[in-house]
Structures are given as C-alpha cells and as structure tokens.
Amino acid sequence: MFAGPPTPTNFEYAYAKRCMVALIEAYNKQYGMQYCYITPSNLYSELDTHKGGRAHYAASLLDKIIEQDSLGGSSIKLLGTGSPLRQFTYAGDIALVIKAMIDNNVWASFNVSNPENYSIHKLARITLDVNGKSDWTIDYSQPHMNGQARKDVSIDKFLQYFPEFVFTKFADGIKKVYIDKTK
C-alpha cells in the first residue's frame, strides 16, 4: 500500500486511505488496541448512484445502458479503450465478510476482493449479455482516458481466514443490480 505514490487520477482518495492505515497501526502499537481495517476492491450495489456526472464504473455503465434502452438505442459509449483490468466486488459480499469477521473474532487487516479480474471491455460485455443486450455495440471514445492499466488486489491473507468464502460472480451481481434499477 505504501510502495510509491498513488496514481494521479485517484491521488487524494488513495492517500487518505494510506493515512487511515498508518493511524490504525499507530493506535494499535501505542495503545495496545486491536483495530483492523479491510481494503475492498471496486464496489457496486443496488444503492450505488450516478450524480453530477460522476459515478463508479458499474453505476455509470448501468445508467448508460438504461438510458440508451429508453431511447431505443443499441450501443453505449465508454471512455478509454476497454483494456484496463479491474476487480469488482458486490457490496453485499463485504457485509458478509464483516459479519464473518465479527462472528469468528477475526481482528486481522486484509484486502477483500472478488478474484475475477476482467478488462473494462469484458465487464461491459458481461453486463450487456446478462441483461439481454448481447447484440449491442460498445463505442470507445477518448482513448487517452484509459486510467491505470490494472489494479490487482491480492486476497491471499483474506483466504487464510476465510478459505471457503464464495464471492458473488460479477455476472450475477450486476444482473441483480440491473433488475433493481429497472423495476
């Protein structure tokens, strides 16, 4: 987490997260506390919103699909080239992890992420496919807006504590969110 500076596109958020980790570790050391933290990968859920032109990827993607569908469209426009790799975790899984930590008295800090690591293009394609829009096209505009090439998260430490945990597959979770947003 502390190796090199955060990526410029996410600098403030990433730096704040690093400060939180340093503070928690300092409290644990100075006061003998057992505070811990989990670091989730990109999250999505039924409660994610798209406001003021800014949104997390999954919410923005779904909003674009829903908007184009309402206009009778059959394509969506996305920034970049679709090549960056990302891991997305259904927010309900994070709630289950926190509950499991409490139930099992686990006070360790670790990353939590769905191990599925897909390109932005594949994530968009999955989202279209599971929602009955396999024939839709994706237009990538502004290739210079690609962002960081990959943001891999190791969950090896998490799996030491919860080796049997089953994450919601992206296809299943994004379909659930789409159904919720279109009802």
Language-model features: where?
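Catalytic helix-loop patch of NAD(P)-dependent Rossmann-fold dehydrogenases
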Residues: 1-37, 42-52
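Conserved active-site helix of classical SDR/Rossmann-fold NAD(P)-dependent CH-OH oxidoreductases
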Residues: 18-25, 58-63, 95-96, 121
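Short beta-strand/turn micro-motifs at beta-sheet edges
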Residues: 30, 65-66
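Short, hinge-like loop/turn segments at secondary-structure boundaries
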Residues: 54-56
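C-terminal substrate-binding subdomain of Rossmann-fold SDR/epimerase-dehydratase oxidoreductases
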Residues: 67-183
